[in-house]
C-alpha cells in the first residue's frame, strides 16, 4: 500500500529475504565440502548420489539434513553429489535472527546462504582412518588376551580439530559394533550437557549428524537413540584456574567412574576410551604439563594423539613415548604408551569469542527448550507424518525460597576479574559492623570449607601421591552463599548435585550432577528466586553449585 505523493510504501514480501535456488555440489573421490553457517540461519543438505559422511557418521541417501550455527565438513570416500538449499531463519536466544527479524544480514553468499563454503581435495581423513584401524587391531588383541582396550588422549592447540577427530574415531568404532567411552575434559563447551561440565558417555549407537554428539535423555521421542552421560560440574573457564586445584580432583573422580564402568562392562573394556581435552593445555602455560600428566596417569592412557603442534609432539615424545602405562596390568603385559603425530585439517578455522558465546548459549537453550531447528531427516527416521520435526521441550517454572536452598560458589578470582563485586542486595544484612565484626554466615560451614583438604576426597590417584601431599594442606575453594539471594544470581545456571546440603566442600566438588536450574529472576526482598527446571516437582534437597564464573550470565533465555 503506497501513500499518495510521498512514494512511501509498507514492507512487502518482495523486500524480504528471498532464498537462492538449490545448488548441486559434486565431490570427487577423497574430497570434502567445507561449510560455515551462522547462528540464526540454516541450510539444508541432501545426498543425491554416492556416499558421504560428516565427522565419520554416514549421511542417508535422499534425506535432508538441516545445519545451523556450525562449521563442518562432509567427506566422501568414493564420490557423491549433494544438494544444498537455504533453510528457515532460526530464532536465537533473544528471539530474533542474528541480524534482525529475517536474519538475512547473517546469511552469506555461498550455497544455501553459507557464510563460507568450498571444496577441498587435500584432507587428513586417510590418516584418521589409519588411526582407527590401528586402534581396532589393539581392540582385537585386547579381546583375545583379556587386556583393556586402548585409552586414547587427544592433544592439540585451540581450533586444531581435536573434537572432530574424537567424533570421527567414535563414529568409526560404533560403525563396527564397538562401544567406546568418550570423555570430554573441556569445560568451554559441553558434550551432551551444558558448558562448564566434564562428562563421560558410553556410545553404543550412531551419533546424530545434525546435533554432533547427539542428545541426552528427554521426556519425548527421539529419532536417534539418546546417550546417558555422567556429568560433573566445573564452573571455571579453563583447567589452569586455581593452579588446577579444582580441576584435578574432578578429573580423578571422573576417571574412577570410567574405570569402574570398564571393569563391569566387557564391551567397553575391550573398546577402550577416547579423551578430548581443552586446547589451553597445549599452549605451554605454567601448570599445563602437570595436568596432562595427571590425565595420562588417571586414565592409564596408552595412545597420545598430538594434532597441529610440533613443539607439543616433541614434548610428549620425550615424556611418554615407550614409557609404561599406569594401568594395573601394565607390569604383567608390558603395556607402553605410544605417541602419534597427526596432521591438522585445512578445514579447521578459528572460532572467535562471539561464536563460542553463541555455542554456549545454544547448548543451554537446547538443554531447557530443545532443538528449535526443524529436521526433515529426523522426521523420516521417526516415521512421522509431518514433513519436518523439531524437539520442543517445556521446562517448568517455579518460585523457590532461597533460605531453603544450599547454594555454593567457588571463591576463585580470575586474573582478569574484579574481586570487588557490588551487590546492593547484600547491604544491611551483614553484621560486619557489629562488635568484633562477627559474622554468623561464616560459622562452622565456612570454617569446615577452609579446613577440608583435597587428600580426603580424591580416591584412586595413581602415581601422584607427592602431588597430593603438596596440596593436602590446601582448602577447597567452595563457600556457601548465605541469604539474601544476590542479584547476580539472575540469568545464571545452578547445578543440582547428588551431595547432601550439608556435605563437606570436597564431597560437593566430587559429586556428579542430577540436573541444572536456570535462575530467571531474583527477589531479594521476598527472599525468592524464579527458576526453570527440566522436570516438574520440588527441587531435591541437595547441594547446589552456582555457575557464576562459568558459563556465567545467560541473558534472554526467558522473557
UniProtKB/Swiss-Prot annotation:
Q: Which UniProt keywords apply?
A: ATP-binding, mRNA processing, Nucleotide-binding, Nucleus
UniProt keyword annotation of ATP-binding present: yes
Primary location group: nucleus
Family matches, as InterPro entries: Clp1 (IPR028606), Clp1/Grc3 (IPR045116), Clp1_C (IPR010655), Clp1_C_sf (IPR038238), Clp1_N (IPR032324), Clp1_N_sf (IPR038239), CLP1_P (IPR032319), P-loop_NTPase (IPR027417)
Q: Which domain of life is it from?
A: Eukaryota
Name the segments for region: Disordered.
415-483
Q: Name one GO molecular function term.
A: polynucleotide 5'-hydroxyl-kinase activity
- Report the subcellular localization: Nucleus
Where ATP binds, per the record, is at 32, 71, 159-164
**Protein family (similarity comment):** Belongs to the Clp1 family. Clp1 subfamily.
Quaternary structure, per UniProt, is: Component of a pre-mRNA cleavage factor complex. Interacts directly with PCF11.
Cite the record's Low complexity compositional bias ranges: 466-479
- Give a GO biological-process term: mRNA 3'-end processing
* Protein source organism: Neosartorya fischeri (strain ATCC 1020 / DSM 3700 / CBS 544.65 / FGSC A1164 / JCM 1740 / NRRL 181 / WB 181)
Alphabetical GO CC annotations of the entry are: mRNA cleavage factor complex
State its role. Required for endonucleolytic cleavage during polyadenylation-dependent pre-mRNA 3'-end formation.
Question: What is this protein's record name?
Answer: mRNA cleavage and polyadenylation factor clp1
Amino acid at each position: 500500500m503506497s501513500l499518495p505523493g510521498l512514494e512511501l510504501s509498507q514492507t512487502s514480501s518482495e523486500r524480504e529475504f528471498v532464498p537462492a535456488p538449490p545448488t548441486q555440489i559434486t565431490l570427487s573421490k577423497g574430497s570434502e565440502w567445507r561449510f560455515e553457517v551462522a547462528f540464526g540461519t540454516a541450510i539444508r543438505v541432501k545426498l543425491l548420489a554416492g556416499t558421504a559422511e560428516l565427522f565419520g557418521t554416514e549421511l542417508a541417501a535422499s534425506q535432508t539434513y538441516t545445519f545451523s550455527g556450525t562449521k563442518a565438513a562432509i567427506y566422501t570416500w568414493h564420490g557423491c553429489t549433494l544438494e544444498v538449499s537455504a533453510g528457515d531463519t532460526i530464532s536465537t536466544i533473544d528471539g530474533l535472527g542474528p541480524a534482525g527479524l529475517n536474519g538475512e544480514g547473517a546469511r552469506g553468499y555461498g550455497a544455501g546462504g553459507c557464510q563460507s563454503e568450498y571444496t577441498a581435495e587435500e584432507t587428513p581423513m586417510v590418516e584418521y582412518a589409519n588411526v582407527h584401524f590401528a586402534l581396532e587391531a589393539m581392540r582385537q588383541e585386547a579381546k583375545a588376551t583379556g587386556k583393556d582396550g586402548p585409552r586414547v588422549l587427544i592433544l592439540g592447540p585451540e581450533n586444531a580439530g581435536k573434537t572432530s577427530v574424537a567424533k570421527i574415531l567414535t563414529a568409526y568404532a560404533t560403525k563396527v559394533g564397538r562401544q567406546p567411552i568418550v570423555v570430554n575434559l573441556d569445560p568451554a563447551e559441553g558434550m551432551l550437557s551444558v558448558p562448564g561440565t566434564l562428562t563421560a558417555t558410553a556410545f553404543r549407537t550412531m551419533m546424530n549428524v545434525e546435533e554432533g554428539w547427539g542428545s541426552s535423555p528427554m521426556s519425548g521421542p527421539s529419532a536417534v537413540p539418546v546417550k546417558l552421560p555422567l556429568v560433573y560440574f566445573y564452573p571455571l573457564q579453563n583447567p589452569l584456574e586455581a593452579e588446577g586445584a579444582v580441576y584435578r580432583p574432578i578429573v580423578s573422580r571422573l576417571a574412577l567412574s570410567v574405570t569402574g564402568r570398564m571393569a563391569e562392562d566387557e564391551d567397553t573394556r575391550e573398546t577402550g576410551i577416547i579423551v578430548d581435552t581443552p586446547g589451553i593445555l597445549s599452549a605451554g602455560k605454567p601448570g599445563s604439563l602437570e595436568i596432562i600428566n595427571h590425565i595420562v596417569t588417571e586414565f592409564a592412557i596408552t595412545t597420545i594423539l598430538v594434532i597441529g603442534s610440533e613443539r607439543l609432539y616433541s614434548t610428549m615424545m620425550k615424556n611418554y613415548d615407550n614409557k609404561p602405562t599406569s594401568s594395573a596390568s601394565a607390569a604383567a603385559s608390558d603395556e607402553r604408551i605410544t605417541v602419534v603425530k597427526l596432521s591438522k585439517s585445512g578445514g579447521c578455522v578459528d572460532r572467535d569469542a562471539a561464536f563460542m558465546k553463541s555455542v554456549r548459549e545454544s547448548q543451554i537453550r537446547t538443554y531447557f527448550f530443545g532443538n528449535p531447528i526443524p529436521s526433515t531427516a529426523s522426521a523420516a527416521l521417526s516415521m512421522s507424518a509431518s514433513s519436518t520435526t523439531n524437539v520442543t521441550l517445556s521446562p517448568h517454572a517455579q518460585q523457590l525460597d532461597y533460605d531453603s536452598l544450599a547454594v555454593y560458589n567457588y571463591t576463585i578470582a580470575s586474573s582478569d576479574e574484579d574481586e570487588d563485586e557490588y551487590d546492593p542486595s547484600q547491604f544491611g544484612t551483614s553484621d560486619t559492623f557489629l562488635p568484633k565484626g562477627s559474622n554468623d554466615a561464616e560459622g562452622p560451614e565456612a570454617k569446615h570449607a577452609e579446613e577440608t583438604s583435597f587428600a580426603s576426597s580424591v580416591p584412586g590417584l595413581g602415581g601422584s601421591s607427592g602431588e597430593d601431599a603438596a596440596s593436602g594442606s590446601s582448602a577447597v575453594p567452595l563457600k556457601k552463599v548465605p541469604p539474601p539471594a544476590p542479584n547476580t544470581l539472575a540469568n545464571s545456571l545452578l547445578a543440582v548435585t547428588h551431595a547432601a546440603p550439608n556435605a563437606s566442600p570436597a564431597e560437593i566438588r566430587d559429586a556428579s550432577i542430577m540436573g541444572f536450574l536456570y535462575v530467571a529472576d531474583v527477589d531479594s526482598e521476598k527472599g525468592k528466586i524464579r527458576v526453570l527446571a527440566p522436570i516438574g516437582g520440588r527441587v531435591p534437597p541437595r547441594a547446589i553449585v552456582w555457575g557464576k564464573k562459568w558459563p556465567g550470565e545467560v541473558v534472554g533465555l526467558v522473557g
